[in-house]
């Protein structure tokens, strides 16, 4: 029998490797196989925390730029009005506590940029790059350390810098100390400003009072000038009224004196006594009669060789005699003055200059053919007045109806 030839057997081809991730490959048969559903799970992309999304939307909203907005450059955001921001927190979060909001910022790694305002920054929180929010991670607590150790664990920094607290309230202690110092400084400035304001108020009040006094004086001066312009003889009348008032202080209406002349009782008046009154002593030269009597060198006295010095009649009569007696005495003298130039300095009415108790010259009124003498002027008779005379003059003018309108207007 013939032998049968066998075809050579080729080795079985290796089975193709199963496809990774399924798709076009078939399912693995058998009990030990696994379907695509039980294969390795593809990791999902990282999600952004809702807190970061809400904060980003608040900062980017133009309607809230006066409360919170991006800082210059867009690398940080600023809370301009913390009170208004805290009031509007409940619209975006479940709370309205500004401190809790700051705590959450610290939890996500935000840091305060400016010490004097609420400005915060993070590398993944940039204007116009919202996709970077997924890079911001929330800090996680270590399972090996207890929460109390985490809150109290300080981190040593470079020499000269303060320790930074890490934990739930990390970084807030330093901020609280800064706020306390700022508050103390502001309180001191407030006290200084209040003191300065009180001082300024007192100065302004003093200036107002001085201005009111100046305005009153100006009104009085303007009223007096208006009266003088309307009535030019007002000054002459005022001077005559003053002279009459001063004479009435010494003479009664019946012509008698109210009090005696102290110079006659106490003797001659010395310069020391009259200098304190502001009066002036006028030397009087009596006439020299043609008699055989001897003239003693006693000033103001004429006597014989055997007689005692007596006061001059011209000095004794001004306050003791009436005006008419003075005129008679002057008329009876042939030569009343040794030098007639003194008499010719007056007008034609032959007025005699008299002196009052204070040795101040006065001009008594007299009649000349039924007419009064010429009015006095301020330039001719500007005499010093005592305080008592000024008070009596003011009282008289206030009771005089002629000057009532002048006082009222002034």
UniProtKB/Swiss-Prot annotation:
Coiled-coil positions: 171-246
Motif (Nuclear export signal): 279-290
Pfam families assigned to the protein according to its UniProt record, in alphabetical order: HSF_DNA-bind
Chain intervals for the UniProt region annotation (Disordered): 1-44
Keywords: Coiled coil, Cytoplasm, DNA-binding, Nucleus, Phosphoprotein, Stress response, Transcription, Transcription regulation
Biased composition (Gly residues): 20-33
Entry keyword annotation includes Protein biosynthesis: no
Protein known as: Heat stress transcription factor A-9
């Amino acid at each position: 029998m013939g032998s049968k030839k066998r075809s050579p057997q080729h080795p079985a081809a290796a089975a193709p490797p199963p496809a990774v991730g399924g798709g076009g490959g078939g399912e693995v048969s058998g009990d030990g196989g696994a379907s695509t559903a039980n294969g390795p799970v593809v990791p999902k992309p990282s999600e952004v925390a809702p807190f970061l999304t809400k904060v980003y939307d608040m900062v980017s909203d133009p309607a809230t730029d006066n409360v919170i907005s991006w800082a210059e450059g867009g690398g940080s955001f600023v809370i301009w009005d913390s009170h208004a921001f805290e009031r509007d927190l409940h619209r975006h979060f479940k709370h309205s506590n500004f401190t809790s909001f700051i705590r959450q910022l610290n939890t996500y790694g935000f840091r305060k940029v400016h010490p004097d305002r609420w400005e915060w920054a993070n590398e993944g929180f940039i204007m116009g790059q919202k996709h970077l929010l997924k890079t911001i991670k929330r800090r996680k607590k270590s399972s090996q350390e207890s929460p109390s150790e985490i809150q109290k664990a300080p981190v040593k920094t470079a020499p000269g810098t303060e320790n930074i607290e890490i934990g739930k309230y990390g970084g807030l202690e330093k901020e609280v100390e800064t706020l306390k110092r700022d508050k103390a400084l502001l309180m001191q400035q407030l006290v200084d400003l209040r003191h300065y304001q009180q001082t300024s108020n007192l100065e302004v009040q003093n200036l107002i009072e001085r201005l009111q006094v100046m305005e009153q004086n100006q009104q009085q001066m303007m009223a007096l000038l208006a009266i003088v312009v309307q009535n030019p003889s007002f000054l002459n009348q005022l001077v005559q009224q003053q002279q009459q008032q001063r004479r009435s202080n010494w003479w009664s209406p019946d012509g008698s004196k109210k009090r005696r002349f102290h110079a006659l009782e106490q003797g001659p008046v010395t310069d020391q006594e009259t200098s304190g009154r502001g009066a002036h002593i006028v030397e009087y030269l009596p006439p020299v009669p043609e008699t055989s009597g001897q003239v003693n060198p006693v000033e103001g006295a004429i006597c014989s060789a055997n007689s005692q010095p007596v006061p001059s009649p011209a000095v004794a009569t001004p306050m003791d005699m009436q005006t008419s007696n003075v005129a008679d005495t002057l008329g009876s003298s042939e030569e009343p003055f040794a030098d007639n130039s003194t008499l010719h300095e007056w007008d034609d009415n032959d007025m005699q200059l008299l002196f009052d108790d204070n040795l101040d010259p006065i001009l008594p009124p007299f009649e000349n053919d039924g007419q009064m003498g010429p009015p006095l002027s301020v330039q001719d008779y500007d005499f010093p007045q005592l305080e008592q005379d000024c008070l009596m003059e003011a009282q008289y003018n206030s009771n005089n109806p002629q000057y009532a309108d002048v006082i009222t207007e002034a």
